[in-house]
């Protein structure tokens, strides 16, 4: 008996030991919800991966719930896929045999806003205007305000919180990719690759992101790697009445396969013109190839290569006189007929491929790091007409308009009613005189053929060709359960070549490389008229140009950026705090590749000096050739974020930050086309920004309210235009521009509770964006070293100030300061119908500094009156506008393998064609008056929104 008991006890102990020796098994469960509405997502497919091996696949039930049991301890990847949502991946760790509750796993809907990118805006011809018309591209489909405003406000080129578009940080694969020269967003570099670039993460305002420190206007990181492209084969066809007739797109992605590889490809073509603007067209293509390799749980490598070769015709701004005469606010002066076919003089031609390689290292749940190297290269050209000793070929040149011949104001010295009648007849009967109201290409060719080979007119191509090398490394470390530390290092080496080349001789045989303005002023000094002085010194004659030859100017913009950042997030129950800092070093310089006769600089040695003297060349301090002084800046910034969660649905959070940023290359040189001269006393831009936010999110309800405030000081700006008073192409360099931006944002989407699946949605952006300083201005001209105005005050920049002290505030232009949208959204059974009404107000015309100097206000008699002050310095305010937009779409999910869908969007349903979306004051002055007492402005130029536009997109996914 005792033996039996001992044997039984031994067997029990052995069985227990065997059980204890086995790995504990646990699991993972949770609920899949719509990130925006918080509604449960039924039939979402969840695939669990261990490394690259697929373990199990389950679907969510009607309440969005799922359960995956019997998992050994370890690290897993959970891939969540559902119709009309972006694919999402999350990391899961199972410990000690427990079933891990993931609670709510949110999916981002594929909204119509994803069709909005930089190419959703017409290419405007405004290179020489000093006007910046770049809108803010709003992403963040998890944010109700951005999700609605990003689509509904795109027509009026809305800028979030009134901030300049270059303050919005855009990352690709963890690399900040804002343009090194201008700071502008780089969206055009991947336009047409919607599927490849669809997966992204966004933070708003001054929040700190996972990928970089960011600024005060949000951060968007586009993943761009193969594993984040939605699995399967997808094709789509789209037609768009505002941009192009046809877009064809196809994409294919394998997802992460059993062998750890993932491959993806995306191609597209955008072709044709549009319904509104003659001469504007697209002939653009795009390609994307990417591969990921998951070696194991710890190591992953990603590579991608893509580009968007193509060309598109540009639209030009015109004066209201021209629009009224033509009876069309969509008139475009950039085109004309050549042999009966439309030809645009202004065409953007680009192909700037990008390649990146990214390494991800994830040794544990508590630490991961990544490093990315990225290289951008290629060509970016922009054609325009150039001419020598010939009539200006632009049809809307002011000397071709009726107002040049007659004006009711007799002081304007325009009193020729006969010529006014002839001009008015031409412009009001444009169909009968197309050769006069548009570019007369046939006349240009005939003129060139009569010049014994030397072309009077050519088509030039202005190039901005970048070689841009970037490195970004970042890490995430969780030293304890309630703390997360992030940081990183960045480096950028950019060399951009600015030059122009002969694109078309237009029937001529050659063109001479001389400076037209210098030839007029220095005809007796031949070396001064040479664009390439070294060639003239060697051969004794100006260069003879053929197609493809560089001429006029040629220089490098050299930019170097290095930085580091660190952030720490600490959680204490419902309260969390994030502190972050950034330290950087930025430098840039100009490197001239062509010695210009007007600015030869100092000889490098005595022999050169003797050669120059023999030719009559006089050395100058200002040089067009060689390396300029180096401008360098140490920059720093700090941020604080506080976040308090109230219950399960509300949170209150605040952000505050102080930032110093180096000026950009394009705003630092007085005349980079001609010489190395930097603006005096350049300073970093200093910004203080703060916002306070309240957010409520529950199933069906999503609300965010934000109050924001910012001061942006010590900005600089350089603009170029022809100055009639100097009879030369002139440059106006401003420094010390301060502004204040404050306002309120509200976004909401709430159920009606009357009709199932019908919601009321709306946004409100109310701002006050004003100038708070009067900057100083330096004016130079391209054909002389003389400084026309040296660091003079612009006393009427921030406001119009009358003699009695009465002030009228001036506002930051480029965006409506009041924008509102209210509408209904219906979502049921994969149908969506949105109808919205928009209201925009408080938009202002972009100002030029010359009109706001004492010199311009005093006029020729050096006397200031209230009449002159108001006339010359007041800022134009645009009329408010109402718009109606409608969107409808449907998708069908077939056997959970195939998806067929369409979306149809109509913008500006009321066909309102009188909405000004922007414009600028010409930097020109009428001085040939009868009284010789005052100056008069030239008419400003405007951009208008087109009438009713539609976009139809049909797609099929395998």
Language-model segment annotations:
Residues 458, 484-647, 672:
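Signature of Gram-negative outer-membrane beta-barrel scaffolds
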Residues 712, 760, 839-857, 890-958:
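C-terminal beta-signal and adjacent terminal beta-strands/loops
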Residues 330-354, 358, 620-633, 637, ...:
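Outer-membrane beta-barrel signature, preferentially recognizing the C-terminal barrel domain
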Residues 311-313, 317-322, 529-544, 587, ...:
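Surface-exposed extracellular loop regions of Gram-negative outer-membrane beta-barrel proteins
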Residues 574, 707-713, 730-851, 955-957:
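Gram-negative outer-membrane beta-barrel transporters
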Residues 137, 144-146, 175-206, 222-225, ...:
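Short acidic/polar hinge/loop motifs at secondary-structure boundaries
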Residues 27, 239-272, 276-315, 347, ...:
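Transmembrane beta-barrel wall of Gram-negative outer-membrane proteins
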Residues 298-358, 381-461, 524-549:
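Acidic/polar loop-and-plug regions of large Gram-negative outer-membrane beta-barrel proteins
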């Amino acid at each position: 008996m005792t033996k039996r008991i001992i044997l039984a006890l031994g067997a029990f102990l052995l069985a227990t030991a065997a059980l204890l020796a086995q790995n504990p098994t646990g699991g993972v469960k949770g609920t899949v919800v719509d990130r925006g509405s918080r509604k449960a997502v039924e039939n979402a497919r969840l695939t669990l991966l261990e490394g690259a091996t697929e373990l199990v696949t389950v679907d969510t039930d009607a309440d969005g719930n799922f359960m995956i049991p019997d998992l050994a301890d370890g690290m897993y990847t959970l891939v969540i896929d559902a119709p009309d949502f972006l694919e999402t991946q999350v990391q899961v760790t199972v410990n000690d045999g427990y079933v891990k509750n993931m609670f709510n796993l949110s999916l981002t809907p594929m909204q119509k806003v994803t069709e909005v990118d930089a190419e959703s805006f017409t290419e405007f011809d405004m290179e020489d205007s000093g006007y910046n018309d770049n809108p803010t591209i709003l992403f963040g489909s998890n944010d109700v305000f951005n999700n609605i405003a990003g689509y509904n406000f795109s027509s009026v080129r809305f800028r979030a919180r009134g901030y300049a578009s270059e303050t919005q940080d855009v990352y690709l694969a963890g690399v900040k990719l804002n343009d090194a020269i201008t700071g502008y967003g780089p969206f055009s570099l991947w336009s047409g690759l919607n599927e490849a670039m669809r997966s992204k993460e966004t933070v708003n305002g001054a929040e700190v992101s996972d990928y970089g420190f960011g600024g005060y206007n949000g951060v968007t990181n586009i993943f761009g790697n193969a594993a984040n492209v939605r699995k399967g084969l997808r094709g789509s066809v789209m037609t768009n009445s505002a941009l192009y007739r046809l877009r064809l797109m196809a994409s294919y992605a394998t997802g992460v396969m059993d062998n750890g590889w993932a491959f993806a490809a995306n191609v597209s073509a955008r072709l044709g013109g549009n319904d509104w603007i003659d001469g504007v067209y697209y002939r653009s293509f795009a390609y994307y190839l990417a591969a990921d390799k998951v070696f194991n749980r710890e190591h992953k490598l990603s590579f991608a290569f893509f580009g968007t070769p193509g060309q598109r015709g540009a639209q030009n701004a015109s004066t209201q006189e021209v629009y009224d005469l033509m009876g069309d606010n969509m008139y475009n002066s950039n085109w004309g007929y050549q042999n009966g076919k439309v030809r645009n003089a202004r065409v953007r031609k680009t192909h700037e491929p990008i390649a990146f390689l990214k390494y991800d290292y994830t040794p544990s749940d508590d630490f991961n790091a990544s490093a990315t190297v990225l290289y951008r290269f290629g060509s970016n050209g922009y054609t325009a007409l150039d001419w020598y000793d010939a009539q200006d070929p632009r049809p809307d040149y002011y000397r071709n308009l009726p107002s040049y011949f007659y004006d009711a104001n007799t002081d304007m010295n325009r009193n020729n009613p006969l010529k006014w009648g002839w001009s008015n007849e031409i412009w009001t009967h444009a169909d009968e005189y197309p050769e006069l109201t548009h570019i007369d290409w046939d006349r240009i060719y005939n003129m060139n053929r009569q010049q014994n080979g030397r072309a009077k007119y050519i088509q030039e191509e202005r190039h901005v060709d970048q070689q841009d090398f970037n490195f970004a490394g970042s890490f995430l470390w969780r030293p304890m359960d309630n703390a997360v530390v992030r940081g990183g290092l960045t480096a950028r080496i950019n060399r951009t070549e600015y030059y122009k080349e002969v694109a078309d001789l237009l029937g001529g045989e050659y063109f001479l490389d001389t400076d037209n303005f210098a030839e007029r002023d220095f005809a007796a000094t031949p070396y001064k008229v040479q664009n390439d002085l070294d060639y003239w010194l060697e051969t004794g004659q100006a260069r003879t140009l053929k197609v493809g030859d560089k001429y006029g100017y040629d220089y490098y913009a050299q930019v170097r950026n290095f930085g580091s950042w660190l952030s720490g997030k600490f959680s204490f129950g419902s309260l969390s705090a994030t502190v972050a800092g950034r330290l950087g070093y930025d430098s840039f310089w100009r490197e001239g590749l062509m010695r210009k006769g007007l600015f030869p600089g100092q000889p490098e040695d005595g022999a050169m000096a003797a050669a120059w003297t023999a030719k009559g060349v006089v050395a100058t301090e200002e040089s067009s050739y060689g390396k300029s002084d180096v401008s360098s800046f140490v920059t720093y910034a700090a941020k604080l974020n506080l976040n308090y969660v109230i219950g399960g649905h509300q949170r209150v959070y605040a952000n505050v930050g102080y930032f110093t940023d180096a000026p950009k290359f394009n705003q630092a040189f007085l005349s980079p086309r001609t010489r190395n001269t930097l603006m005096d006393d350049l300073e970093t831009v200093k910004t203080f920004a703060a916002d306070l936010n309240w957010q409520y999110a529950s199933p069906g309800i999503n609300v965010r309210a934000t109050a924001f405030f910012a001061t942006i000081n010590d900005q600089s700006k350089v603009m170029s235009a022809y100055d009639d008073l100097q009879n030369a192409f002139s440059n106006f360099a401003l420094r010390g521009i301060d502004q204040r931006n404050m306002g309120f944002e509200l976004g909401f989407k709430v159920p009606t509770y009357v009709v199932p699946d019908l919601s009321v949605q709306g946004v409100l952006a109310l701002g006050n964006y004003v100038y708070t300083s009067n900057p100083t201005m330096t004016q130079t001209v391209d054909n002389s070293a003389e400084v026309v105005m040296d660091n003079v005050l612009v006393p009427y920049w921030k406001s119009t100030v009358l003699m009695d002290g009465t002030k009228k505030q001036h506002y930051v232009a480029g965006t409506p300061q009041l924008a509102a949208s209210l509408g209904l959204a219906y979502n049921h059974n994969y149908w969506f119908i949105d109808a919205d009404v928009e209201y925009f107000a408080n938009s202002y015309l972009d100002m030029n500094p010359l009109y706001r100097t004492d010199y311009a206000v005093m006029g020729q008699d050096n006397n200031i009156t209230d009449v002159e002050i108001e006339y010359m310095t007041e800022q134009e305010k645009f009329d408010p506008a109402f718009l109606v937009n409608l969107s409808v779409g449907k998708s069908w999910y077939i056997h959970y393998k195939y998806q067929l869908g369409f979306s149809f969007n109509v913008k500006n349903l009321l066909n309102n064609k009188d909405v000004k979306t922007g414009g600028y004051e010409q930097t020109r002055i009428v001085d040939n008056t009868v009284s010789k007492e005052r100056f008069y402005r030239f008419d400003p130029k405007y951009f208008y929104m087109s009438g009713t536009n539609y976009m139809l997109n049909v797609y099929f996914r395998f």
